[in-house]
């Protein structure tokens, strides 16, 4: 089967080479490279990332990887993806299987095809600028209308991330205005449509790359579909930023953007209590340092050892605080055991409740107090209970007790002193209470 597939691909490649190039309109002025990628160096085979570096880049929380360091052997990776898509190793539902089947129908692109599509995308963006200047319409509106005419209005409504999604009426109005342009400007409309079609083709041909990367991040707090969705956003960003003149393989370039989009989504959405992205990077670095020290020492490193390895500005207290932030929250309703008849919260002690020993002692003390106070009059016993907080745990003032009985505060003081003298005089009544003081 593999040989027949390779023969078909070879025959298809020959057909592409034999076809005469389509006559293109007058070339547009060259665009300037994206500002945030100006410093990207030319790829050097001797500087390709080594295997340990690639393992670090694969860390699900590593957001620090430089763009030029993420040069992977993408040809082998994409061949593996083509086989893995039919039988994904992760748990999937029917919508995921259907999605994998659909994207598996799009053939992979050669380097020459990627460059050709990227060139058309770039020319299309420049053409949209020209149309915006000529018509006064917003560039984003023109781009979305052109996209809607290619994909269909129903599909454009489902595209996530658009600030304003044009309705069918707006699409037809703007499209009619664009079609009524002079002949010399219609050339730009044709180029813009070709650029949008090339953009869509470049995205669809690399959707399997997103799936391959997203599978490495399962179990991190986001569902598989959410990971794919976030990775697709990174892929779209990569298409917009790709510079074909540097002759990078697009899958190599897009890998960094896809990982970054997934990593940021995990940092923002996966936790119940959100942690800032910069703190996620710090936690990731701290975890790598702790793992490295554990391998070197053969034991769990102390906070002081980790702080020393982290460098200036770190101490044991900061290490401890950072590790506490990294802890995952656990629901009190999490089932425990195979039968799942108990919950995690059932095994957490309530620090506000007394221990069984303290509760038993408190019960015995209450009984002895009742016996001692039973020898006093009802009013004297109630005054002592209110003044000493034996009823509600709060010691009431003389004014409060006086208001309760409808007498003055001085009269309450007299009743209290008389009751205490009775208890002190009859020591046999209070002897057992003294045992609770020890």
Swiss-Prot record:
Region (Disordered): 1-69
Sigma-70 factor domain-1: annotated span: 93-128
GO molecular function: DNA binding; sigma factor activity
Major subcellular site: cytoplasm
Record keywords, A-Z: Cytoplasm, DNA-binding, Sigma factor, Transcription, Transcription regulation
Annotated segments matching region Sigma-70 factor domain-3: 281-359
One annotated GO biological process: DNA-templated transcription initiation
Compositionally biased spans, kind Basic residues: 1-11
Positions with biased composition (Acidic residues): 27-45, 52-69
Compositionally biased intervals (Basic and acidic residues): 12-26
Organism superkingdom: Bacteria
Span list, region Sigma-70 factor domain-4: 372-424
Record-annotated DNA-binding residue ranges: 398-417
Subcellular location: Cytoplasm
Entry keyword DNA-binding: yes
GO CC terms in record: cytoplasm
Similarity field: Belongs to the sigma-70 factor family. RpoD/SigA subfamily.
Domain remarks in the Swiss-Prot or TrEMBL record: Contains 4 domains, connected by flexible linkers. In the active conformation, the domains are in an extended conformation, each making extensive interactions with the RNA polymerase catalytic core. In the autoinhibited state, sigma-70 factor domain-1 packs closely together with sigma-70 factor domains-2 and -4, contrary to the extended conformation that is seen when the protein is part of the RNA polymerase holoenzyme.
Protein name per Swiss-Prot or TrEMBL: RNA polymerase sigma factor SigA
Source species of the chain: Thermus aquaticus
